[in-house]
Amino acid sequence: MATDKEYLEYVKDQLSEAEGVSFRPMMGEYIMYTGGKVAGGIYDNRLLVKPTASAKALMPDAPYELPYEGAKEMLLVDNLDDRQFLRELLTAMYEELPEKKKK
C-alpha cells in the first residue's frame, strides 16, 4: 500500500519547524532527509526513523517496524502532533546519521 498524498502533506506540515527536512518519492513511498542525510521515511502512512541512539532515547517505547519486506527495522514515530518534539528528534539524530554516500 502506498502512502497517501494527504498523509505526506500532514507530515510535511508537522515537520515545517525542523530545519533542512526534505522528502524524495521512491516507489510510492517517501524517503526523509534531514540536512541531506537519510533520517527515515514515510511508508504505508507511517513515519519511521532510523533507530539511532538519540531516537531510541527520545522514544524508548517506540515499536520497531519494517518499512517494507526485507528492509531493516525502523522506529515508528507516533507523536506527530508535537512539532517541538519532532524538531528535537531530528536535530538530535542528525549527528548520528551517516554522511551521504559519494558516487
Which residue ranges define each predicted feature?
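Charge-dense, helix-prone N-terminal extensions
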Residues: M1-K103
